[in-house]
Amino acid sequence: MTPEEEAHFRVLQAIAREPDITQRELAEQLGLSLGKTNFLINALLEKGAIKMESFRRSDTKLKKIAYLLTPSGISERVRLAQGYLIRKRLEYENLKAEIDALERDSIVASIQSGESKV
């Protein structure tokens, strides 16, 4: 999964959870700049993965925008999720192996120094 695909996946995930999220809220949630978030939204709109709908909230007179996943956006999200899961599982296994090695080294060092921290 490329960094761009991961960014698209994270945007699609956020929109699926909260369609009426603003770009500013999305940027904060994903830790991205507002400009980068706008770029990602526009790329997903161009790909046909999402569409925009405007509506009025009953408690205000302001128009709001909702981002909705299209059928191709849902398929894209599923495809990207599979790659994301594979990568995250691999990262988890590597991290777990590193933690296990550090714990073994720590136990060996404790035994060698005469401490018993087990």
Language model features with spans:
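Short, cationic-aromatic polyanion-contact patches
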Residues: 1-8, 22, 55-78
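Pre-recognition alpha-helix immediately N-terminal to the DNA-recognition helix
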Residues: 9-13
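Key DNA-contact positions within bacterial/archaeal DNA-binding proteins
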Residues: 24, 35
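Alpha-helical residues within the helix-turn-helix
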Residues: 28, 45-46
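Amphipathic alpha-helical dimerization/coiled-coil segments
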Residues: 75-118
